[in-house]
C-alpha cells in the first residue's frame, strides 16, 4: 500500500480514503504466513512513509559511529523515506574505545540519516523494501534492530545487549555482498563479552551474494524472529538461518545509513575516522518504500521485556545507566547526557540530575551539562521511582 492521491474531494471522502488505507494495511498478512495463521501488523513499528512521523520514529538518536545523525538528513517525499549521508565537517563528543574515554570536540567529517522506532519488540516478522545508495564503496544502507546495554545483568550467561541485522548493504569489497548478522554482549567467565560476526561466525554471521545490484532498484529484505530460530529473507527467498541463542531482549527497529571504508577504519571494537575525508560521491541516499512488522497470534508468548508488549500493571525501575563514567570538557562547553532507565517496561522513567560542584559544572533537568570552571564535578542521575542512581565525573580543563 502506497500513497493515495487526493484531489478536490470533500472532507468526508478524504476521511473514508484514509480509513480505507489504514484498514488495508492492518489486514495485510506477511509473505511468510501459512494457511490458518493470523498475524497482526504492529502499527508503531510499521510505516508506508506517506508523512515524516516523529511520534513513531526518532530521527536524531544517540551517536555511536564516526558520523553524526541529523534530523534533516532524513526526509519523506513521494511515499519514500530517504536517508542521506553528507560530507560535513563538525565536532562533537566521541567515545574513544582504544583509550576508554569520552573526548570532547572530536573532529568528524560526515553526517547521515536514521529512523529509530520509539516502540520496541522482539519476536515477529520484519520486512522493508529498500533501494541502496548509489555511492560504492563508502556507505552501508542498513535495516536492523538493537537493544539497550543493560550493565546490571552480571550473572553468568546474562545477555546485556542484542542486535539483529536484517540486512547491511554494500559494506564489503563486492557490491553484491550483503550481511545478515547478529551481535550481542553476554557475560562469560564473569565478564561482559562482545560476540561479533567476525569472531563468532558459526553463531553470528550470515553472508549472502545478492543476484542483483542493490543500488539499482527496490528489493525486500526480511527476518522472522522466534524463540528458537532467526531466519533471513531477500525478495521472499530464505538466505540464512541461525539458532536464537541470545536475541530475546526488547529492541528498537532501525533504518539507517552508516559510513564505511575507505572513510572508516575498525579498531578497538569500533569505527574510527580514516585518512580519507573525500567529498567525492556525497551526498548519497538510500530509500525505503515501506517497513512492516507483524506478530503471529498464539505463538509469540514471552515474558515482559523479552519480545512482548509491556504489561498493564505498574512496573518498577531496577536501575539507571549513564552512557559513560567520565567525560572531559573545556570551560564554556556543554554536552547532553544519555541515561537509560531499566527495565524497558518501567512505568515511571523520569529522572533528576544534580551536580556535586556547580562552580565547576552545572546540569539542567534535560541532562545538559555546562562546564563553568576548571576542576571536577560528579553528575548524578536519580530515578524518581525507587531512587536508583548512576554517576559520572566531569573534568573541566
From Swiss-Prot:
The record marks 260 as: Important for substrate recognition. The active site is at 163 (nucleophile), 165, 168 (proton donor). Keywords: Disulfide bond, Glycosidase, Hydrolase, Periplasm, Signal. The keyword Transport does not apply. The keyword Disulfide bond applies. Its EC number is 3.2.1.83. Residues 26-299 form the GH16 domain. Residues 316-387 form the BIG2 domain. It is found in: Periplasm. It is an enzyme of class 3 (hydrolase). Its main location: periplasm. GO terms for molecular function: kappa-carrageenase activity. Disulfide bonds join 98-268. InterPro entries: Big_2 (IPR003343), ConA-like_dom_sf (IPR013320), GH16 (IPR000757), GH16_AS (IPR008263), Glycosyl_Hydrlase_16 (IPR050546), Invasin/intimin_cell_adhesion (IPR008964). GO terms for cellular component: periplasmic space. Belongs to the glycosyl hydrolase 16 family. This is Kappa-carrageenase. The gene is cgkA.
Amino acid at each position: 500500500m502506497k500513497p493515495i492521491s487526493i484531489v478536490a474531494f470533500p472532507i468526508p471522502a478524504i476521511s473514508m480514503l484514509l480509513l480505507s488505507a489504514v484498514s488495508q494495511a492492518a489486514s495485510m498478512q506477511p509473505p511468510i504466513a501459512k494457511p490458518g495463521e493470523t498475524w497482526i501488523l504492529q502499527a508503531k513499528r510499521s510505516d508506508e512513509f506517506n508523512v515524516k512521523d516523529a511520534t513513531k520514529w526518532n530521527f536524531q538518536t544517540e551517536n555511536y559511529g564516526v558520523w553524526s545523525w541529523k534530523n534533516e538528513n532524513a526526509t519523506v517525499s513521494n511515499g519514500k523515506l530517504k536517508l542521506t549521508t553528507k560530507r560535513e565537517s563538525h565536532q562533537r563528543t566521541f567515545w574513544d574505545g582504544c583509550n576508554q574515554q569520552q573526548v570532547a570536540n572530536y573532529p568528524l567529517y560526515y553526517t547521515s540519516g536514521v529512523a529509530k522506532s520509539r516502540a520496541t519488540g522482539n519476536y515477529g516478522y520484519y520486512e522493508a523494501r529498500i533501494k541502496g545508495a548509489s555511492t560504492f564503496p563508502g556507505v552501508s544502507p542498513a535495516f536492523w534492530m538493537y537493544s539497550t546495554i543493560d550493565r546490571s545483568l552480571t550473572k553468568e550467561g546474562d545477555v546485556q545487549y542484542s542486535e539483529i541485522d536484517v540486512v547491511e548493504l554494500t559494506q564489503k569489497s563486492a557490491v553484491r555482498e550483503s550481511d545478515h548478522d547478529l551481535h550481542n554482549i553476554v557475560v562469560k567467565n564473569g565478564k561482559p563479552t562482545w560476540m561479533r560476526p567476525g569472531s563468532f561466525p558459526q553463531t553470528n554471521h550470515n553472508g549472502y551474494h545478492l543476484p542483483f545490484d542493490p543500488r539499482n532498484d527496490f528489493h525486500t529484505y526480511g527476518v522472522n524472529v522466534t524463540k528458537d530460530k532467526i531466519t533471513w529473507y531477500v525478495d521472499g527467498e530464505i538466505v540464512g538461518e541461525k539458532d536464537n541463542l541470545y536475541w530475546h531482549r526488547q529492541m528498537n527497529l532501525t533504518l539507517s545509513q552508516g559510513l564505511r571504508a575507505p572513510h572508516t577504519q575498525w579498531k578497538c571494537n569500533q569505527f574510527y575516522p580514516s585518512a580519507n575525508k573525500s567529498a567525492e560521491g556525497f551526498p548519497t541516499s538510500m530509500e525505503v518504500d515501506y517497513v512492516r512488522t507483524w506478530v503471529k497470534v498464539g505463538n509469540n508468548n514471552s515474558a515482559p521485556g523479552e519480545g512482548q508488549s509491556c504489561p498493564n500493571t505498574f512496573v518498577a525501575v531496577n536501575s539507571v545507566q549513564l552512557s559513560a563514567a567520565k567525560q572531559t570538557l573545556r570551560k564554556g562547553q556543554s554536552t547532553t547526557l544519555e541515561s537509560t532507565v531499566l527495565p524497558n517496561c518501567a512505568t515511571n522513567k523520569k529522572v533528576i540530575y544534580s551536580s556535586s560542584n556547580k562552580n565547576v559544572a552545572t546540569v539542567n533537568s534535560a541532562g545538559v551539562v555546562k562546564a563553568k570552571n576548571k576542576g571536577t564535578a560528579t553528575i548524578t542521575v536519580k530515578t524518581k521511582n525507587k531512587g536508583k542512581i548512576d554517576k559520572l565525573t566531569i573534568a573541566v580543563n
